[in-house]
Amino acid sequence: MTELKTLLPYLRPYRRAIGLGLSMVVLSNVFIIAGPYLLKLAIDGLGDPGRTRSDIAALAALIVLAALLGGAAKFWMREILNGTSRRIEADLRNDFFRHLLRLDVAFFGSTRTGDLMSRATNDTLAVRMAAGPAVMYAVNTTVSFAFSLALMVWISPRLTAVALVPMVILPPIVLGFGRIIHQKFEEIQEQFSTLSTMVQENLTGLRIVRAYVQEEDQERQFDALNADYMQRNLALVKASGLFHPLLMLLSGSAMVIALWYGGHQVISGRITIGDFIAFNFYLALLTWPMIALGWVVSLFQRGSASMGRLNRILETEPRIRPPTDPTPLHHVRGEIEFQEVSFRYPGTEREVIRGVSFVAGAGQTVAVVGPTGSGKSTLVSLLPRLYDPSHGRILLDGIPLTELDPLELRSVIGMVPQESFLFSETLRENIGLGVGLPPARALGSSAGRRPEDGSNPSREIERGYAPSGPDVPGKPEGRDERVEDAARVAQLHETILTFPKGYETVLGERGINLSGGQRQRATLARALARDPSILILDDALSAVDTHTEARILEDLKTALAGRTSFIISHRVTAVMNADRILVLDEGRVVEQGTHAELLARSGTYATLLRRQMLEEELEGGGGAVQEVGGVREGSLHG
């Protein structure tokens, strides 16, 4: 159970509450222990001629009072300690979530979402049970055992020694079953993670499941996983089911021995009837801790297994870390330089980017084209430091990216990824995500930093949410105006106005109630709304028809003016006006230059353009075709 040591920092802020709760544990046991002793005095007093009826009545009243005070102390014991464990659970879950946001993209590429969800829910619950009820009953069991045993020895040391003979084999039973329960519970949690992952994937990919008629196959897979989960739980039930009866057998044996030997003690006059009755009450109080011990051990073992699973995530350090003394960004010009940059994904040997070198001048538009799998998206993902190069370096305005705070770097970059992601909030909040005036609820935002230094998490969230300060270019004066202006550039404003609630339309999960093109335009508007110094469009218009694409590109000319931009597109016609075009093939820059320069070389770029023009001509049924630098181009408006 050494894993639970890492829970100590979470207990320290509540040490006063825990101390008060544990004092209630001791107090409740004092009152409970007093009851049998008062009963002994009353019974023994029945044969004493000097005792009056009022004396017996007074003892009876004290017994009732002790029971009431013991019950009140137990109530506050549970109220304080269980309430504290709930707060500890909330703190642990918050830290777990903050830590997840600190981790780099590579971590999530190798970790199942369902597994993380299981740790954030089931495992934190198991840790709470160990931090609250298990601690409470462990102390209660220890105190009750100590008080009861002390009074039993005081009544009759010999009877106590005989009655406790069955307890000799208790420690090895507890240790042995404790290890079994720990192992079984960890296996259950691992299987629950697998089960959660499958449910999450099926809910997310429900359209694919139905499109490929995979319902029955997925049901069979789920049934198999669920059956395995059930079998693992049944194995734990069997272990616990054997553990508790063994404890009951030991305690029952102790009671039988006490009745037999204690009866002889009364007959021989060594103890009184009151002593005998009180002894059996104390033995019963001793029996409950023995029975509860199995439950407490089970809770601690489950909590230990779950804390171990949480620790494996909490102890994972992000590969992308801010430098100790980061260089501040002032008046970003946007000059980007790649110097012999190579990259391979963690855990792989194949380089997907190989020796790439180029310079993007401040305010220039750089296009990246190439066949599928050539490394285009990977190349631009290195700019906001989603990954770090395996070799070489990237500079922003002459400063290596590794010398910059990643949060500050990302605050000046607007990125439109290939996969459009929208939150289950209003369109206004989605588009305004990076504007800097936080909505009622910061959508999925966080600093991604665990507040170990006692800082205010909400301030960290604001820092990760949007750029701030006088040195950040284009800080918005009005959030709504910026949102709507960005939507106009993305050709989405008029569409939004047709919705009954306009910008206040609440989106479904991942924006499912929008079309693919509308989702792409919304993510484009989100990037534009924050007015970044550097804009990255990763195939951002692939789901948009050519007519809408042409209008967006026309409006983007004004939006891109004065800012460095990187455009990835599978349509070569969308990047012909770029200041520099990079042609990637198998991770290498095989050509670079302007549109005219690359056409003149009749290389890979010219081949890609000819192929696409032919495809557009065939799709358009031989529609309008014009000559562009000696290459036939299908009209964007055709």
Feature locations, PLM:
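ABC-type nucleotide-binding domain
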Residues: 323, 329-440, 444, 456-463, ...
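An intracellular "coupling" helix at the cytosolic face of ABC transporter transmembrane type-1 domains
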Residues: 13, 105-106, 122-131, 135, ...
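Short intracellular "coupling" helices and adjacent cytoplasmic loop segments at the cytosolic face
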Residues: 86, 94-118, 122-124, 197-221, ...
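Cytosolic ends of transmembrane helices, especially the final helix of ABC transmembrane type-1 domains
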Residues: 204, 214, 238, 286-313
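Hydrophobic alpha-helical segments in the permease module
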Residues: 63-70, 74, 167-171, 240-254, ...
